[in-house]
Amino acid sequence: MAKRIPMLKARDVMRVLRAVGFAAKRQSGSHIFFQHPDGRTTLVPRHGGEDIGRGLLRQILREAEITPEEFSENL
C-alpha cells in the first residue's frame, strides 16, 4: 500500500523543489513560481504558516513531474 502524502509547510515543499533542481523565478503576492532548467514549472502558495493540503501537494508534484517517492526521498 502506498504511503499517504503528508501535509507540509510551503517552506518544506520549496526546499524539496530546490533539491531536485527547481529555482524560484518570480513571486506574485503569496505565490512563488518555480522553474526547472528543462522547462518544467509549478506554483507554490505561501500563506503564512498554513499547511499545503494533500490535494494541492499532489497537483504540485504532477506539474513538476516528481513522483511521491522522489519527493519523500528529498524531504
What positions do the PLM features span?
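Basic nucleic-acid-binding interfaces
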Residues: 1-75
